[in-house]
Amino acid sequence: GTPYLNPDFDKGQIIFENGNTYSGEIRIDLVAQNFQIKGKNGKITPIEVNDKVKIEINGNQYKLHAINSTEYGEIGILRECIELENISLHYFPRKKLQKPIEAGISAPTSGYGKTDNPEWKDDGFYFFQINSKYLRVPTKYKKLLELNIFDEEKLKTFRKKNKLDLKKEDKLIELVKYFNDN
């Protein structure tokens, strides 16, 4: 794996607050939390953006958000899943370095031991954004109840009616729409 959302550069657009746009080849560096553009000469340039700039890649909108979390960092590039008045859903694409799992039994060393290099693994998750606060979406229903952000009875009703799966984006979007209106 790589520290990039997609190792290849994709056609994208940078949309500035004043309405100006820049189209070109763009990719996201998830570790440095910045965007990179590839010039016509093949030169790769990292670009710093603020929370007023939107980046569109493959139909998805990304934006820098001030998460202000000790656990997830001050800022993060989030993909906008749905933005509504009372509650929004964002995806936080992340990668982490993970060492390969080694077998329990090892052969005697020959001096030519091959150590496996760590690899970049997807480690992304969703955030609810409520009143400018970012709450990580848990993958377990009980943990969602413990967050105490939704009325428990309404949540139970929604869960029964909609087969809530906290790992599926389309189900989370339905949940956000439901609680935005109720």
Give a label for each model feature.
Residues 5-15:
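A short, Trp-centered hydrophobic/proline-enriched beta-strand micro-motif
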Residues 15-141:
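Aromatic-patch recognition
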Residues 111-179:
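A short, solvent-exposed beta-edge/loop patch
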Residues 1-3:
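N-terminal secretory-pathway/extracellular module detecting exported/lumenal segments
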Residues 182:
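Short arginine-rich
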Residues 7, 28-29, 159:
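Aromatic-enriched hydrophobic runs in primary sequence
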